[in-house]
């Protein structure tokens, strides 16, 4: 599209023009009324947000929740295992919900039974454990468990159950089954009743491809063979992804087992799924454990147990989540009322996916190279073969893949929520990305695990980016997503037109005169502010330069009897105003995690880093740590530490200053557990007074907590480095390491790039101070060359030695102006372009050795002597000589 746009100028591409004219017409929306109005009424929380992870979890509507809570307020629901009136009401309501579920899937209780589970994964586990497997013997055949390689982890995990009982598991590639379908043969040896199980997804959660539902009958009848083994085949259809946006007719496609998760369909409740079991297969299921409510009779002292006759009651151990089951009724009612049914949702979501697919496929760099690589087994020609999922990786103009983690960070700057990784589907990930089994093992050895941010290893992607649509998705969402791709990859805010989408509530094409169509303008300007950014434009936005721009900052007043100058300071020997190469120019600590910096010229060093650096953090009412990613206004909270009075003074505009003691009162302190970067830390609440102060400032409940002095949080092995012998680094509430160092020359290089005029002749100016504050470093040095610090393995600052752990992988927080709280995504984007692969800036440090028997300090003006990586073995050489090898 972009390449063509260079020739056709500003010609807009209509929504109808994006489709094949010969293709069947598809609907957008749900009849009379604007979809925008529905969004505003039912999903007002999405204002300013583009949510594109519906395959992960779709969203509940406001009226759905209101209807459910009203039900709870008006009725008394007791335990369904009791016999009182409220319990009878619960039992009868739950049974009605079972019927409603069966009706939703076009079947009845004559054919299927609904077994409630904790989710589709629990339903799969139930089948794996209860299926009538026959173990393979020395001279006898056994059952086979076959599964499509394009399956969720929870399906593949069933093989561990079968392996334990000597049942062979066989993965089947989609292409092998497609080719087998073409040459399907008649059933062989129909008298053999050895039970086998074949599992496949109705829709791939990786690419959205939809596999033929006809496979169910073909496999069961013996016309299609997953493997050439005689016996009776049963079919498990993993419908969790498929039924979120499409109707499933179980009267026509009678799979034996169908696991589903309800939050995939209407967002709430979570933690509730079901296994739909065909009644002809139900008697074959075997069960070992029995829980409450599943027994007709049993003896506690003898091996006597009679199960319930009802299949559902036999397998639903304990009390089901009956209130969540009742919530399903309101989910089905709301879905029907808002959309008219699953067929409409199917058409609507596919329309969005098809349009996005065509637009993405057409995006090109000026040199003709594609902007994205889409992983798909279809051309998005029909909702029968493709669901509303698009899986892709972003490319640069040379065809190199941009890591998915980097794309995710950029998307968050545009308030776009998407999914990255392999999506719990390693088989499809390997197939589409060309990752061999050996590469998977190699990636694991390199430190990559499922769900992390290690997106590229030796230039090879370990995963991809996925967007997916739900019933409340709109063309506005698509436009915002396309603007994001164009803005970040084609480096323009106006030269490349975004397709203009005209959609009516029935057919594609230009809207009729009397329609209430959603018309999406081709706007390429700056995106609208998110709710957080809107909040920042109010009265509490100001320049807090008094905190960070007061240079030089007077050193803290310390007890002179205990704080004599150390060799570290004496070794610097550099007077203020006469700073030479490789000296410390600025020192910052951040007493409250994610809040404003406290700049000093001289500060004590503790065993966790600078004394009191990130010793406190702000948490929400659930005890979850807040960062500037969720609450940019944290940077407007200004802490000051007074070591003499042993207090921290906290200031913010419009608020009276408040004092917090530096240490806890051990007699009154109640220790509680918190988490920082997956680590458990012991903390204590700093009291109701500061909690009220913070809650008033942020407009929501907040607490200030401090790491307990008895808390021991050890540094992990990261960045591929071991700690030096004899050291055991401990951490405060920092994310990664004790210190972060940045180089002024590196800031200058980024400053130059940011202040370069763009194609429109505009200039976006960032001061050096602004840029340096965004990176929230502890130590700033004035090195000679940009990014030379990335070649260092150790440094000495005076007599203190530090190990260089590795680079800091930057996130979207660097886009937040630390003096105003406003966002500007260009900082991250420019850094991403200049660093090419990873968005790295600054180096993590930790103490190589530290003797705290006498006070130690870091000071502005101290000399910084680096040790190069290639010379790290030669510790006998003076650091200055090693440095001169490359800088002289």
Curated annotation (Swiss-Prot):
Q: Which residues carry this modification: Phosphoserine?
A: 34, 528, 530
Keywords of the record, alphabetical order, are: Disease variant, Molybdenum cofactor biosynthesis, Phosphoprotein, Pyridoxal phosphate, Transferase
Catalytic activity reported: Mo-molybdopterin + L-cysteine + AH2 = thio-Mo-molybdopterin + L-alanine + A + H2O
Q: What is this protein called?
A: Molybdenum cofactor sulfurase
Cite a single GO MF annotation. pyridoxal phosphate binding
Transcription regulation among the record's keywords? no
Q: Give the pathway.
A: Cofactor biosynthesis; molybdopterin biosynthesis
- Which SUPFAM superfamilies does the record match to this protein? MOSC N-terminal domain-like, PK beta-barrel domain-like, PLP-dependent transferases
Q: Which InterPro entries match?
A: Aminotrans_V_dom, MoCF_Sase_C, MoCo_sulfurase, MOCOS_middle, PyrdxlP-dep_Trfase, PyrdxlP-dep_Trfase_major, Pyrv_Knase-like_insert_dom_sf
Q: Which cofactor does it need?
A: pyridoxal 5'-phosphate
Domain of life the protein comes from: Eukaryota
Which part of the chain is the MOSC domain? 706-867
A GO biological-process term: Mo-molybdopterin cofactor biosynthetic process
Recorded E.C. number(s)? Answer: 2.8.1.9
Q: Which residues carry this modification: N6-(pyridoxal phosphate)lysine?
A: 264
The entry's family comment says: Belongs to the class-V pyridoxal-phosphate-dependent aminotransferase family. MOCOS subfamily.
Keyword Phosphoprotein included in the entry's annotation: yes
Q: Which organism is it from?
A: Homo sapiens
